[in-house]
Amino acid sequence: MMNQWTLPDYVEDMLPDEAVYLESLRRSILDLYQAHGYFYVIPPMLEYIESLNSNGQDMDLDTFKVVDQLSGRLMGVRADITPQVARIDAHLIHNEEVTRLSYAGSVLRTKPASFLQSREPFQIGAELYGFKGIEADLEIQTLLIKTLNTIGIKTPVFDFNHLDIFTSLIASSNIERDLLDRLYEAMQKKDQSEVKSLTQSLDKKNREALIALVSLYGDVNILKEAEKVLPQDKAIKNALQFLNQIDKALKASDIKISYDLSDIRGYQYHNGLVFSVYADQCYS
């Protein structure tokens, strides 16, 4: 017989010591963001599903769905706060100039990102809107480095990609939605044989480029390799040049830098530079 107090898998209580520690970090990080001009917003836990997925279906499978008892419409529990903050900037703030927003809160996902992670992770971050160019990206990178220092993470590894590379390839290939979803999964798994199988109907140039993306990860030398094997498309050339500029700008920082051109998470609602951060003190 199941214990009535048993929690679902990958969901847990946070006891006093952990809760106090998390709250201390939350306050320190939000104070840091406020000092740099980022205004705090609190999006709702629930939204209509079409609003949560208005910029793409990237998080659809991770989203818990319920029927609104008032309207009968399908609602979702947020699995990521980032699209919500983008919605707030686009539809509520109406600022034609630069907007800096910060956020913090729990999200809920149908499955954990790994067997070591919770399905109810706490998400905190800052978003910069209306300011394009390398200066904007460097501002966010610098703020993130300060955030990591605030929570005691030293010598992190920054893993960069520029989504214009992938989106340029698929835009000129006219790939159907279902195939694109399967290609995305194969890219995330770095399953080169599956990418080869899925792209058989594409023209030779783009097919070879998509297959090559899977193996294009490593240090800055990967960018030189990418220049050789990827099409001489203007958007791709600009993206690789941008990544080279980021590398030069951040070399003075106490971080390690790597690149993964097949890491296309969020490509449906993000554009430009994207990155992940890894540290010995964290799982991911």
Annotated model-derived regions:
Residues 41-75:
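Polyanion/phosphate-binding surface patch
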Residues 18-36, 47-50, 72, 82-95, ...:
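Positively charged, Gly/Ser-enriched RNA/tRNA-binding surfaces
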Residues 120-124, 158-168:
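Short, conserved phosphate-binding/catalytic loop or strand-edge motifs used
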Residues 1-18:
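Auxiliary tRNA-acceptor-end handling modules of aminoacyl-tRNA synthetases
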Residues 167-177, 269-275:
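Short glycine/threonine-rich loop-to-helix capping motif typified by GTGT followed
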